[in-house]
Amino acid sequence: MKIAILNDTHAGIRNSSEIFINYQERFYDEVFFPYLLENDIKQILHLGDYYDNRKFINFKALNRNRHHFLSKLREYGISMDIIPGNHDTFYKNTNDLNSLKELLGHYMNEVHIVMEPKVVTYDDLDVALIPWICAENYQKTMNFIKECKAPVCGAHLELAGFEVARGQACHDGMDHKIFNKFELVLSGHFHCASQRDNIRYLGSQMEFFWSDADDPKYFHVLDSSTREVTAVKNPLRLFERIKYDDTKNEYFDYDVTQLKNKFVKVVVANKTDPFTFDRLIDRIQNEDVHELKIQENFSEFIGENVVDENISLEDTATLLDTYVEAVDTELDKKKIKSQMRELMREAQALEIS
């Protein structure tokens, strides 16, 4: 038996922007469901964060998600097991009130919501499913892990030391050794894929922020017989970063058609010919891009008046961490950084409407 695995699909992300709703629809219509139909896959396992906003969801996003995802489950005879992620729960200390139970009730024949840690059997493979761990279910989850005999675990975990985004590690969270007893742990939550020991963060299947640019996205298929996990690439890109250096590259014949309906950032390393640069920018703007940002190289301004010459001007998270480190306080700086990053993510989610 083969099980398609999704996680962190975030319906309604970026303030329920039409851009992201259309992008998600393309993924399901052009990539995900065609693969499932071609390979006769009838089971989905969703590892949390089905919805994006833990407080509310836009009716437009809800309607579109029903049409391009939930109705397809019924149409194609596909079942889905799902655990709540932190974005699916209203409160941070309990999973009891969550969007999955409130909004997916019409599809209970197709969607099975797993609210408590439990073992689900897919043919001959037992998989331990662990919802988002919070204060209320922590001890119950620890007891479940201690007694569990399943070789594979599917969860929505926040583990210390793993990458939240490329080059940005989670400074707090649980010790991953708690899950040492499992042969394989598949987790959602962090949007970039990574692996250490028996822990495999699958990463998001789609691009939602600039941190996702140049970070390949996949959905996954678990074979219950072999326990092999196959990554299936999502070829649809939404963010495109161009590193401009006219001392090394020619741009007169640069294919700008690939940039249509994308967010584009031109990072200028060297610009010796302003005419060539301006012509490229004009051509990009004529392609109906969602947004064009130009990031100039300000290295000439970095000198003795700047304390840290290694700060990346495009990495907001690094700037926030650097600022917190420079503050003279007895408060827990790891917690402050975590809160700052959470506020940054919430601000990014509200950026586009």
Q: Could you describe each region identified by the protein language model?
A:
Residues 2-3, 43, 125-126, 152, ...:
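Structural motif
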Residues 10-14, 52-55, 81-94, 120, ...:
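Active-site environment of divalent metal-dependent phosphoester hydrolases
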Residues 73-76, 144-148, 176-181, 257-260:
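Short, conserved loop/helix-junction motifs that constitute active-site signature segments
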Residues 2, 9, 13-119, 178-182:
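Core catalytic region of metal-dependent phosphoesterases/phosphodiesterases
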Residues 224-353:
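Accessory, non-catalytic peripheral segments of nucleic-acid enzymes
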Residues 88-177:
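Conserved catalytic scaffold of divalent metal-dependent phosphoesterases
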Residues 8, 28, 44, 49, ...:
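Divalent metal-coordination and catalytic microenvironments
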Residues 165-230:
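Conserved beta-sheet core of the metallophosphoesterase superfamily
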